[in-house]
């Protein structure tokens, strides 16, 4: 994306660029330098509701399907999964930063409309659930960030209310 922007002639016609990242889907395999950033991080244990008894039996992650949608694999496994997930998010954040920096270098940033959105989150062991298949906050509370062109005078804001694309 950065190479395309660097070589783009903005006087020709407007540029539409859709950038998609395969991460942070499982398996959580971030580049090592990003994982190293979280080596000593205090990673929280998953939230476990007292109603989760049917999933509470501890399972061995080595003997369970890699993409199991639920299971108690223990807090250490959950923290390590989160460490890898956070490292993937940091990797993505850096890549987005590279794209924004390139837009600025090409003097295209102020005219750019940038929309950052994710299709889902991940349960990361909360309530012994994994992946994206549940209507809990971990699956549904995702970023939706819009940076308007500077010519549009849009009042900045933030909401925790549900939003949608139309």
Name these PLM-found stretches.
Residues 2-165:
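Active-site-proximal cap/lid insertion segments
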């Amino acid at each position: 994306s950065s190479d395309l922007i660097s070589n783009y002639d903005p006087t020709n016609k407007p540029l539409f660029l859709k950038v998609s990242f395969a991460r942070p889907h499982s398996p959580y395999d971030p580049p090592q330098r990003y994982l190293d950033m979280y080596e000593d991080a205090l990673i929280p244990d998953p939230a476990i509701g007292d109603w989760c008894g049917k999933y509470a039996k501890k399972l061995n992650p080595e003997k369970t399907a890699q993409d199991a949608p639920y299971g108690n694999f223990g807090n250490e496994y959950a923290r390590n999964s989160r460490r890898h997930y956070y490292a993937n998010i940091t990797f993505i954040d850096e890549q987005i930063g590279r794209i924004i920096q390139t837009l600025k270098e090409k003097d295209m940033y102020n005219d750019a409309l940038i929309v950052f959105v994710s299709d889902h989150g991940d349960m990361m062991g909360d309530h012994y659930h994994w992946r994206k298949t549940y209507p809990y906050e971990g699956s549904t509370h995702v970023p939706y960030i819009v940076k308007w062109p500077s010519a549009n005078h849009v009042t900045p804001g933030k909401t925790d209310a549900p939003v949608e694309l139309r």
